Amino acid sequence: MVNNDKHDPLMLARQLPLKSVALILAGGRGTRLKGLTALRAKPAVHFGGKFRIIDFALSNCLNSGIRRIGVITQYQSHTLVQHIQRGWSFLNAEMNEFVDLLPAQQRNATDHWYRGTADAVCQNLDIIRRYRAEYVVILAGDHIYKMDYSRMLIDHVEKGAECTVACLPVPLEEASAFGVMSVDKQHRILDFAEKPDNPTPMPDNPDMALASMGIYVFNADYLYQLLDADHNTPDSNHDFGQDLIPKIVSQRLAWAHPFTLSCVTSGEDENQYWRDVGTLEAYWRANLDLASVTPELDVYDRHWPIRSAIESLPPAKFVQDRSGSHGMTMNSLVSGGCIVSGSVVTHSVLFPRVRVNSFCSIDSTVILPDVNVGRSCRLRRCVIDRACNLPEGMVIGENAEEDSRRFYRSEEGIVLVTRSMLEKL
């Protein structure tokens, strides 16, 4: 009898994740998020009422069956390390399951920080080789999406690829922020350019370009050879998008994996949700997406749960103040430990332990944990950073000139408020 197990998709979906290790690149500064990343790495930024951004990549790994994970850290890593220790320490080491933290560190062979994404992996090769994985999945730790990496691994193996790059169409006018590729009918990558000034449009859709998601699958031995060679190339930027992927494409060894094949959706919903929340506007908008009646990203999906650190908090409370005004919310996410007293909260996201005192009006605003909103405040189109104490009567989002003088105001009119900004008033 012929054994076809090695070609059975269900068998491959179980086996390939067990033969893989995921490396999450989580050392980025995220400078476009301004004050939100002054004291924390971008992957550690709060998102969606109770999560951190990195929870999406970590949850995708777990749900895909990948339980050997390395998180490569560098910039302002304490908050990120603390979150992973508290929320992701439940894997069973006896079953060779782990989330390893791989910080930048002084080594005999190097005297510098990570110089690029490829160098970040290269500097940890001594550790990564000990994992004895057949496949290495490289992930960005700062995107919001749900994806089954096992489907990408199957695609990689069935094509006999050395490297597979996840991709999706993006509007042509936005494509200069991504790696852009051209592919043939079999999805072999023919050309790749990192953040080109003039992105190549898709042949069948000239208003769109095919962009890299920053998600790669490599045959492990091939990756190690590439990294060793790149390490010894003096003029390299030591970056996957700028150096390694173009080199692999020139050798015709790279294949594209359309996000449509591995995007996780709920029920009849076919929206392929992926967001780079690298700017304040994108971050604000993606948070408020979750507060809509039918959000494109379903975080309530029991079949693909997004995990995070769990806090023991009392339920959110909406109370009547002494004047008889009721605490009310509409189209909003309100987390545990919040108290809304005699105020109205509309289309907003309140993270844990937010206190909204009486007579406030809050609209289209994201409020991070431990914020106190004083009486009679009016907030509109804001992001309030953690542990801010807004004084009584503060108005934000109604006067552009005043907002720009006191806080950071984006071109689209989103206002960021941090503790350091409040201390200067």
From Swiss-Prot:
One of its GO terms (biological process) is glycogen biosynthetic process. It is an enzyme of class 2 (transferase). CDD domains: ADP_Glucose_PP (cd02508), LbH_G1P_AT_C (cd04651). It catalyses: alpha-D-glucose 1-phosphate + ATP + H(+) = ADP-alpha-D-glucose + diphosphate. Alpha-D-glucose 1-phosphate binds at residues 114, 179, 194-195, 212. Pathway: Glycan biosynthesis; glycogen biosynthesis. The keyword tRNA processing does not apply. GO terms for molecular function: ATP binding; glucose-1-phosphate adenylyltransferase activity. Signal peptide: none annotated. InterPro entries: ADP-Glc_PPase (IPR011831), ADP_Glu_pyroP_CS (IPR005836), GlgC_bac (IPR023049), GlmU/GlgC-like_hexapep (IPR056818), NTP_transferase_dom (IPR005835), Nucleotide-diphossugar_trans (IPR029044), Trimer_LpxA-like_sf (IPR011004). Gene3D superfamilies: Hexapeptide repeat proteins, Spore Coat Polysaccharide Biosynthesis Protein SpsA, Chain A. Keywords: ATP-binding, Carbohydrate metabolism, Glycogen biosynthesis, Glycogen metabolism, Nucleotide-binding, Nucleotidyltransferase, Transferase. Its EC number is 2.7.7.27. Belongs to the bacterial/plant glucose-1-phosphate adenylyltransferase family. Involved in the biosynthesis of ADP-glucose, a building block required for the elongation reactions to produce glycogen. Catalyzes the reaction between ATP and alpha-D-glucose 1-phosphate (G1P) to produce pyrophosphate and ADP-Glc. Homotetramer. PANTHER family: GLUCOSE-1-PHOSPHATE ADENYLYLTRANSFERASE, GLUCOSE-1-PHOSPHATE ADENYLYLTRANSFERASE-RELATED. This is Glucose-1-phosphate adenylyltransferase. It comes from Pectobacterium carotovorum subsp. carotovorum (strain PC1).
